[in-house]
Each structure stands twice: as C-alpha cells, then as structure tokens.
Amino acid sequence: NPEPLPENLTEISSVDKENACDFGIVVDPDVDRLALICENGEMFGEEYTLVAVADYVLSNQKGNTVSNMSSTRALRDVTEGYGCSYASAAVGEVNVVEKMKATNAIIGGEVNGGVIYPELHYGRDALVGVALFLTHLAKKGMAVSELRKTYPNYVISKNKISLTPEIDVDNVLKTMFYI
C-alpha cells in the first residue's frame, strides 16, 4: 500500500533498525506527504513532521502557522513558544492554504505529513519537507528520536462524531480548541 501510514511501513521500519540507518524517509506516490522513521525503527509521527519543520522555519523567521483541525496542540505550542500565532483550518489542503493566506502564515500543512511552505509555493510538498527537516536535523546535531523527544507529546483520537441540527458546532469547536 503506497499510503505512508505506520501500518504500511512495518517493513521499512524493520530494515531501518536492522541496518543501523540514521533514519528513513517515505513519501506517497504523488510526493505530497512525508513520513519519517527514527533510527530505532519507530515512527517519528506524521503530525510531528510538520511540527519539526515549523520549529526550524520559526527559529529562522518569526511568523504565523496553520494546520488542519485534525491536529493535536503540538504545532500551536511550538508556534506560541516563538511568540507567534497559530490558526487552525478545516481539513483539506485548499482550506489550509486559504487560512495560511488569510493569516500570512510562513509555514503550515496537514498532519498527514503534508508540508506547505509558501516561500516556494502553496501546495503540499514532501521534498520541501525533507529539505527543511534534514537542515533542521543537521543544525541540531541529534538523532531523529532525540529530536522527536523535544516536542510536546500529545495523543489524538480521530473518531467520527454524528452531528444533529441541535448541536452548535461552532461552540463545540471553540470548546475543543480553547480548553
């Protein structure tokens, strides 16, 4: 299966670990999503790809960030740690791009490993993500698993919720994002 999801990457994770590789890089067939594998064979975490890349970008240039609502607070925490603003957008690349333009964000993306870096173009681009991640890793001079430990550790459960007309969706979202 070409989807860069943990359940589809068990073989490369094993190869990465067995061969003492420094890390593994996996992209999907149209190269708009990126997954990283730590030297120990564990997944870096597709959401944390954007977090790490944003950390690097924000360390060099202050600015806003955007990710979709299917995210943990990790990007928000890293962004606010630099004294910058984070915004969330509806799921979908077009929604993230619209919010990035509206907030003048310098980095954003979807938590499926889709990095959007408007300095180059407004589209998810795994190769841009690879370049930014590798630069960040080289400057930090640490193993991929050690870099991952520097970010807030959140767990997200992506469950479908049935909505009825009586439910105030705006209030639910406001409550979720400002707890």
Range-by-range predicted roles:
Residues G141-I179:
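Catalytic-core signal marking the mid-to-C-terminal active-site face
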Residues N1-K140, N153, F177:
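Phosphate-binding chemistry for phosphorylated carbohydrates and sugar-nucleotides
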